[in-house]
Amino acid sequence: MKEYKDTLNLNETTFSMKGNLSVNEPKTYAKWQEQQAFKRMQNRKDNHGDFTLHDGPPYANGHLHLGHALNKILKDIVIKREYFKGKKIYYTPGWDCHGLPIEQQILEQLEKEKTSLENPTLFREKCRDHAKKFLEIQKNEFLQLGVLGDFEDPYKTMDFKFEASIYRALVGVAKKGLLKERHKPIYWSYACESALAEAEVEYKMKKSPSIFVAFDLKKEGLEKLKVKKASLVIWTTTPWTLYANVAIALKKDAVYALTQKGYLVAKALHEKLAALGVVDNAITHEFNSNDLEYLVATNPLNQRDSLVVLGDHVSLEDGTGAVHTAPGHGEEDYYLGLKYHLEVLMSVDEKGCYDEGIIHNQLLDKSYLGEHIFKAQKRIIEQLGDSLLLEREIEHSYPHCWRTHKPVIYRATTQWFILMDEPFIQNDGSQKTLREVALDAIEKVEFVPSSGKNRLKTMIENRPDWCLSRQRKWGVPLAFFIDKRTNKPCFESEVLEHVANLFEEKGCDVWWEYNIKDLLPPSYQDNAKHYEKVMHILDVWFDSGSTFKAVLEDYHGEKGQSPSDVVLEGSDQHRGWFQSSLLIGCVLNNQAPFKKVITHGFIVDEKGEKMSKSKGNVVSLDNLLKKHGSDVVRLWVAFNDYQNDLRVSQTFFIQTEQHYKKFRNTLKFLLANFSDMDLKNLERPHDFSPLDHFILEALETISAGVNSAFEEHDLVKGLNILMAFVTNELSGIYLDACKDSLYCDSKNNEKRQAIQMVLLAVASQLCYFLAPILTHTIEEVLEHSQVLRAFLQAKDVFDLKGISVLEKLHLKEFKKPENFEAVLALRSAFNEELDRLKKEGVVKNSLECAIEVKEKALCENLVEELLMVSFVGVAKEKLSETPAFTLFKAPFYKCPRCWRFKSELENTPCKRCEEVLKER
């Protein structure tokens, strides 16, 4: 029998089924770099506006992990999506270069080398070199992800110009009257020997002693209450702070009960405390707390007086209703102390050990000198003697240093703060506090997800003043001079701008290198002897929080507009970068420095647990890229609900690889089947069939859905719409029905050419929607298809833009086939019956069948195409009958070329195939 395979249109494409991504992607990216792809993104001339995404800087220390990849890939998808919509893109990646982790790395390195480095300039030089090294490492690792941005000129917070900009932002805060030096309790990391801001504190479970202690009322108090014995009972989980107790706080207007044994507690808590065995059951007297105010008790640890005061923070839900108050070790205690003029006792050094103040103020025995507070607690508890009513251990949420993961303490020190509740002048001449301005600004920002708005609002509503100063070396100094004559900072503009100019020219190392005279402008140098330097450095959150000024404002729009269109970071940045940026923006410009905030979750393992080396559940980013390629990693990011935590395991990546293969193989099929098109046919109108109109209308519908989802940054929804279309309407219906025409019709056949135009339209939209995510792959698609490039008038992926399917195909409207849903229902019923006949061995495939449809209104051609039968009508040999149709054995012979049962003679081509063969 004659072989007809070579007469079919079995077109091939050089676009491979196997992507070999880990090998090919680096070559593609190198080409983009050579062609300056990002410059093209910056210079788009479609006049659809500009788009600025401001990069929250990663820390220049260590290698990238999967969390970094998640963040940078999401940003890349967002900016490419805006670019393909026709906008000019501004995106400058940056790095946070100062701070404690780098200091710790250098200190560990020096310890290994058994050397010390007292010279701060040389120490800072080592820190700078360390940051440079990892900045380059991370930059190269980012590029492997296929992300684009201004990586040729990234921002670095340690650059001289940048340090000067950070300092000028600080000066702006000072000029508004919001920067003040205060002696008050702040979070202190004894492990880092430095103050911490709220954003640098994380809460973890910690075991602590829980003790109930009796403070005996002094004689005058007993006489006032007309009782012989009364002891206020306090509860604390920080026995080490008892040395600094100066007061006991009660709830205002609350009832306090005195027991038979003389213990005084809140009546609302008496029953609970009696059940614990802290106090006895019998109540002999009741007092209003207001009548107890200003009584004096005795601290059993050191016999010092403890004043009874009233505080709004006192709870009647737990504890005793009598709160141990040490203004040197608690913020609420401190503010209560201001009201009652309480003494601030604080005798703990920067390492967390008791200092000589315990001796000078007779707070503790000298044997405690130099002992760490947590080690001393056991002795302190023992020293309480009979005043200790109950001791037990509890596990509770406790603040820890986010860098060292060690517990932190409250410690009163002199620090610099940005004041949240100090009114300052607004643009309209009114006065508002920073808290008020920030809360107003939040209302004008869009949040994705929307829950982020209330989260940030709550944090701003409840946050304390921002502690800016750090007792370290690697950072931007709080470069102010204190006038020794007045003990006030010099905020003269001439002095501050002179220092800023020095930083810009020589870097802020000069603050350590130069003497005071050389740091002052000439007109102030004669008074140098009256000044001393502030030697604290800035909280690194101020560095990163002021990046919008250094990157967007100082470059006057060359690197984007301020406020930026979008910022996109992990959800932890509500208490970090989003908050610091918001506060600085509100001080300097009375507005948020961003229009939209998008947040993502964290990377966790398949059980939902945080990844850590100790658990052995870390998934290596480098290994993922080598095994799957960056486009699969990018698709994994996009196909997950990134607004929640992302679970990761090899199983998830294998699933993603299947999604990727579906998209890739679909594109390969499309490319192959329009590869033989004559380019002259691209611009002329075509005669589209009802089936063509069906798929084109479906394409238009899903395009609107995908666009809408992507506009809302719902990548999962958009991709699921796209995947459902590819799987169901496209592959499951249209492509199956069109294969006969594509493979067997003449290349000049109008029906086939119309189908090819449809395939081009589908490929175009797939490329447009997938390009922000699978950029390497879509570049490869275009590289391997001259026809698609001509259709889109695009030489590569960066020329892509959205198309109007109607306009591109010269159509005014889509004409959906009549009764199409009925034909699809018929197809479903037919396939069920066909499966039964196949299992029974009656037929091998649908082409062996003829069908008589009982609903005569259905289009016969459409039925034949969609059901892929050889004949619609009655034939001799009945195979089966259902209420909707009757199946017959096809009445003609099998065509040896197209395999349809259309031939009038055995082993002879059907009429259609004969005509095609004549043309060849």
Swiss-Prot record:
Binding site for Zn(2+): C895, C898, C910, C913
GO BP terms in the entry: isoleucyl-tRNA aminoacylation
Key word Membrane present: no
CDD domains registered for this protein in UniProt: Anticodon_Ia_Ile_BEm, IleRS_core
Record keywords, A-Z: Aminoacyl-tRNA synthetase, ATP-binding, Cytoplasm, Ligase, Metal-binding, Nucleotide-binding, Protein biosynthesis, Zinc
Protein's cellular compartments: Cytoplasm
GO cellular component: cytosol
Enzyme Commission designation: 6.1.1.5
UniProt: L-isoleucyl-5'-AMP binding residues: E569
Cofactor: Zn(2+)
Record has Disulfide bond as a keyword: no
GO molecular function: aminoacyl-tRNA deacylase activity; ATP binding; isoleucine-tRNA ligase activity; tRNA binding; zinc ion binding
A matching Pfam family: Anticodon_1
PROSITE patterns for the chain: AA_TRNA_LIGASE_I
Motif window: 'KMSKS' region: 610-614
HAMAP family: Ile_tRNA_synth_type1 (MF_02002)
Comment block on domains: IleRS has two distinct active sites: one for aminoacylation and one for editing. The misactivated valine is translocated from the active site to the editing site, which sterically excludes the correctly activated isoleucine. The single editing site contains two valyl binding pockets, one specific for each substrate (Val-AMP or Val-tRNA(Ile)).
Function: Catalyzes the attachment of isoleucine to tRNA(Ile). As IleRS can inadvertently accommodate and process structurally similar amino acids such as valine, to avoid such errors it has two additional distinct tRNA(Ile)-dependent editing activities. One activity is designated as 'pretransfer' editing and involves the hydrolysis of activated Val-AMP. The other activity is designated 'posttransfer' editing and involves deacylation of mischarged Val-tRNA(Ile).
Quaternary structure and partners: Monomer.
Name under which the protein is recorded: Isoleucine--tRNA ligase
